[in-house]
Amino acid sequence: AVTNALKHADRIVSPKYMTAGNGDGGPCHPRDNIALSWFAQEIDLGYDIFGDIMRIREQQAENVAHELCSHGRDIVILGKSFKPETHLTDGSASMLIGHYCEQMHKTVHYDGAPSTKQKYTYLLAHNRDYSNYNFNKDSIIVDLYRKHQDDNNTVIHYGNSNR
């Protein structure tokens, strides 16, 4: 029954959602997972996958923050909203990463660097083309989607075990 149901969920269970990248976000998914986690515990489901999804989201955000902070520079997060093409920041995984960076006493800027001379650690938080973005020279770029190339900066394809 579960397998047959998943066959009809091709809008959600699709390559669009099965790529490396930033954590789940938005005003709906995290809220829904929290409610479903409560319900799973309320009915003693036996395994709370929804709670685990939220714990993993938090842990992954903290892991990315550790990577960003490990370079000792101020941080610029490109992509403050919860997804591209919107200004909504409710449940933004990028802002969660920024929160953890601030807890580690780092200065975080969103969607642009305040200085053109300073070297930053950039986070490419959305799955989009950044090839025309004017990164400050000799900066570090952490790419969650493992696509960006840059000859003037160090690029880290986060999560790539073949680097």
Model-flagged regions — what are they?
Residues 1-163:
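Structural/interface elements that position substrates and couple domains in central-metabolism enzymes
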